[in-house]
Swiss-Prot record:
Region (Regulatory domain): 390-513
Cited PROSITE patterns: AIPM_HOMOCIT_SYNTH_1, AIPM_HOMOCIT_SYNTH_2, PYR_CT
Reactions that this protein is recorded to catalyse: 3-methyl-2-oxobutanoate + acetyl-CoA + H2O = (2S)-2-isopropylmalate + CoA + H(+)
Enzyme class: transferase
Lineage: Bacteria, Bacillati, Bacillota, Bacilli, Lactobacillales
Identification of the protein by name: 2-isopropylmalate synthase
Length: 513
């Protein structure tokens, strides 16, 4: 049975979701979890886009041991050189180059001829292959490219040294039947003296990203690309967890399997949700809260008698398990570290005293600490440590608020605000510290643990009126007002960074596949 490689682009294409900005520390944490999950290759970023993107790829390259790391580059020599430099320290480096091949992109986006595109492919793939052995080529907007020219473009890339050929459905235009035919045409006609592995990269504009990806695998693709929870610009990307579970449940049909440790699926999905600030829809396949819930009495009766009557996926398969070792205020450091090990949570030993101290403070507030609490505690710590400012204190008196912030130079800022309510007052006080022109687009609170004493994630979306950039920022705390203050403070830190360094993404977010 064929083993399909899984290529995760949550850190690159997923970060193109409006408002989603992962810090470098968050990206490294996510990458380590993706490696634990069994992902074959991680697209860590677009190094030419910004200094932060370059540094993130570099740090991830150093951190991973088994999973390959790739970096995206346009078919531009300087882009490729940046990508090569960024992955230089990876154990298994790869480079991913792309150029658009559809008539509409060549005519209106690049204003170049098909012959010029072919020459550029040959030049840039050769340049990449001279420096890194494994090169992937993507003809952007492949599904709207004329078949004859698509074949020429792919053959040119293969002749120049590409080992992987990715066929992006950039605008989510194709259907499963059409997409399968494209793969069959390429697999049957591309000439090479070595194995060439084809992969789908699907967007979900028509709601068919996962179906299209599976159709490509059925047609012979050996690798599949996607993101955790299907995050991505517009309607998102193919959800990797859905593809992996579909291959597992229907291996009889696809005759293929994934390399993923499926028991790590829920932990991975929750981590991405926490760091992106995008809640997992309750009715989402595989990882949604309702995926294993049964309202109908007939269904409930059937499941109680035999779970397979209405469940084709067991909760345990994707890592949903009962809280086997609950913690409380009397639990010691050993029990806490044992729980981190049980939950497969990676952490730096230097972080342990601070994490344990936060655990003890939480235990004073909650009678019983659940697994979800521990995950929230861990992700909240990463969010809290967003470089720039720390919330020392927040006090509320009716419609008035006092906040105390500390910057990375240990300078203390105390500010007061007055608003229509407690949250508005907090935001007004924080505005006086930073004094940026922001527009609050959305504010939401989502309980990440159960019970009246639950921890919650507060997410704010703000627009930097100086640039038009939208940022999502998070705050995790059992005190909703404190979580709100952390989230809004972090949003201001992101705006501060953009205003001081110039636009975070100097290359358009639409420069991708």
């Amino acid at each position: 049975m064929r083993k399909i490689e899984f290529f995760d682009t949550s850190l690159r294409d997923g970060e193109q979701t409006p408002g989603v900005i992962f810090s470098i520390a968050e990206k490294v944490t996510i990458a380590k979890q993706l490696e634990k999950w069994g992902i074959s290759v991680i697209e860590a970023g677009f190094p030419a886009a910004s200094p932060d993107s370059f540094e993130a790829v570099k740090q991830i390259s150093k951190a991973l041991k088994e999973t390959a790391v790739t970096a995206l580059a346009r078919c531009v020599i300087t882009d490729i050189d940046k990508a090569v430099e960024a992955v230089r320290e990876a154990q298994h480096p790869q480079i991913h180059v792309f150029i658009a091949t559809s008539p509409i992109h060549m005519k209106y986006k690049f204003k170049i001829s098909p012959d010029e595109v072919l020459k550029t492919i040959d030049k840039c793939v050769r340049h990449a292959h001279e420096q890194v052995e494994v090169v992937e080529f993507s003809p952007e907007d492949a599904t709207r490219t004329e078949p004859e020219f698509l074949l020429k473009a792919v053959q040119t890339a293969v002749d120049a040294g590409a080992t992987y050929i990715n066929i992006p459905d950039t605008v989510g235009y194709t259907t499963p039947e059409e997409y399968g035919k494209i793969f069959k045409m390429l697999i049957d006609n591309i000439k090479a003296d070595r194995e060439i592995i084809f992969s789908p990269h699907c967007h979900d504009d028509l709601g068919m990203a996962v179906a299209n990806s599976l159709a490509a695998i059925k047609a012979g693709a050996g690798r599949v690309e996607g993101t955790v929870n299907g995050i991505g610009e517009r309607a998102g990307n193919a959800a990797i967890e859905e593809i992996a579970v579909a291959l597992h449940i229907r291996k009889d049909y696809y005759q293929a399997k994934s390399p993923l440790v499926l028991a790590e699926t829920m932990a991975t999905a929750e981590l991405i949700s926490q760091f992106s600030g995008i809640a997992i829809p309750k009715n989402k396949a595989v990882v949604g809260a309702n995926a294993f819930a049964h309202e109908s009495g007939i269904h409930q009766d059937g499941v109680l008698k035999n779970a397979e009557t209405y469940e084709i996926i067991s909760p345990e398969l994707v890592g949903i398990k009962h809280n086997s070792l609950p913690l409380g205020k009397l639990s010691g450091r050993h029990a806490f570290t044992e729980k981190l090990t049980e939950l497969n949570i990676s952490y730096d030993a230097k972080e342990l005293p601070n994490l344990f101290e936060r655990f003890k403070r939480l235990a004073d507030k909650k009678k019983e600490i659940t697994d979800a609490d521990i995950h929230a505690l861990f992700t909240g710590e990463t969010v809290k440590n967003l470089a720039g400012f720390i919330l020392n204190n927040v006090q509320i008196d009716g419609h008035k608020a006092l906040v105390e912030l500390k910057n990375q130079d240990a300078e203390i800022y105390v500010s007061q605000g007055e608003g229509s309510g407690s949250v508005d007052a907090i935001f007004q006080a924080i505005d006086k510290v930073f004094n940026y022109q922001l527009k609050l687009i959305s504010y939401s609170v989502d309980a990440v643990t159960n019970g009246i004493d639950a921890q919650a994630t507060t997410v704010v979306s703000v627009e930097n009126l100086a640039t038009g950039t939208i940022f999502n920022a998070k705050g995790v705390d059992y005190d909703v007002l404190k979580g709100s203050a952390i989230a809004y403070m972090n949003a201001n830190v992101l705006v501060q960074k953009e205003n001081s360094q110039g636009k975070v993404e100097q290359i358009s977010a639409h420069d991708g596949i």
